């Protein structure tokens, strides 16, 4: 019997001056970056929580505690890959994933293909299995005011 599981993930970080902006593992030329203990990559963080949740495992904060000095400035794609290994040990494979950036800017279109490639590489899957999209909140809320960015992700696992 084939078993399917769905997981969701959500992450948000404040935008901060003097910090590089990394989204989907791609460094983007932008005047502000995402504050966080790691590189603040909300796309990778949301996807990490989605795959962990689908497998019924702990969340990203339990697996990689934000206060752990060893994780300061960590590459979020490496964290995603480590989390994915825990998921794979339980026999799961990725059917597909969908990751959405929520914010007014930056525009993702010029970077989308590379983000898909890098997120998929961390999961050791074909980029066709990982969708990367963006939406705005039409100026509403903290993302609409440009105070931060958010991301949500859905992952479907199969075994």
Model-flagged regions — what are they?
Residues 2-118, 122-123:
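RNase III-family endoribonuclease catalytic core
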Residues 126-129:
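Short acidic capping loops at alpha-helix termini that bridge into adjacent secondary structure
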Residues 132-136:
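Pyridoxal 5′-phosphate
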Residues 145-159:
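C-terminal edge-of-domain segments
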């Amino acid at each position: 019997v084939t078993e399917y599981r769905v997981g969701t993930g959500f992450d948000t970080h404040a935008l901060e001056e003097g910090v590089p902006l990394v989204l989907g593992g791609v460094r983007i030329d932008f005047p502000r970056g995402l504050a966080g203990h790691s590189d603040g990559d909300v796309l990778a963080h949301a996807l990490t929580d989605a795959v962990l949740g689908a497998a019924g495992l702990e969340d990203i904060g339990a697996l990689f505690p934000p206060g752990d000095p060893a994780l300061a400035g960590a590459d979020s794609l490496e964290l995603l890959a480590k989390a994915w290994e825990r998921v794979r040990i339980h026999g799961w494979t990725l059917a597909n994933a969908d990751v959405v950036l929520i914010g007014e800017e930056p525009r993702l279109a010029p970077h989308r293909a590379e983000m898909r490639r890098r997120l998929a590489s961390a999961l050791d899957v074909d980029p066709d299995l990982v969708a990367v999209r963006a939406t705005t909140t039409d100026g509403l809320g903290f993302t609409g005011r440009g105070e931060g960015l958010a991301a949500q992700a859905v992952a479907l696992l199969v075994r």
